[in-house]
């Protein structure tokens, strides 16, 4: 992983893939959204492409979660960190095992509302509505 980092400055963010596991830690499947080759703060218009657990920010970029968000503070945090980072580096490695059922899954509706608010704040209302229409169409035609 370290050998794949180009340049002299350390990346602002290292990110990678996520395995979904059961409560016993057994592999179930790879997360349906895979880490993109190139990631920018605008990438999250497509959804949370990288789990925050597989997203490592350089210490000088880290800031607290915005606690007004109960279920999607990680989504907002990642966007804010990516906006500040000059270089985001895909490790091309599976970095974490993630439990199949988390807080966001159990509170799905509230989480979606929060994400809509977060996306509207970072990307604008019109862009957020457009992307959500695409999400709905994609679900209908799967």
Positions of predicted regions on the chain:
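Conserved donor NDP-sugar-binding/catalytic core segment of glycosyltransferases
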Residues: 1-28
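Conserved nucleotide-sugar donor-binding catalytic segment
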Residues: 16, 22, 29-110
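Generic structural signal for secondary-structure transition and capping sites
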Residues: 10, 86-87, 124
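Catalytic core of nucleotide-sugar-dependent glycosyltransferases
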Residues: 94, 105-130
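Alpha-helical elements of Rossmann-like donor-binding domains used by nucleotide-donor carbohydrate transfer enzymes
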Residues: 1-4, 76-80, 114-118
């Amino acid at each position: 992983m370290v050998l794949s980092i180009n340049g002299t400055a350390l990346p602002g963010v290292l990110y990678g893939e996520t395995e979904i596991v059961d409560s016993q830690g057994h592999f179930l499947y790879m997360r349906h959204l895979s880490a993109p080759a190139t990631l920018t703060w605008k990438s999250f218009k497509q959804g949370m492409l990288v789990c925050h657990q597989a997203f490592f920010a350089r210490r000088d970029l880290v800031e607290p979660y915005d606690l007004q968000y109960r279920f999607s503070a990680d989504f907002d945090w990642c966007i804010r960190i990516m906006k500040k980072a000059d270089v985001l580096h895909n490790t091309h490695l599976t970095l974490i095992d993630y439990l199949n059922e988390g807080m966001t899954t159990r509170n799905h509706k509230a989480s979606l509302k929060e994400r809509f608010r977060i996306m509207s704040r970072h990307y604008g209302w019109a862009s957020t509505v457009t992307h959500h229409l695409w999400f709905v169409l994609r679900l209908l035609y799967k």
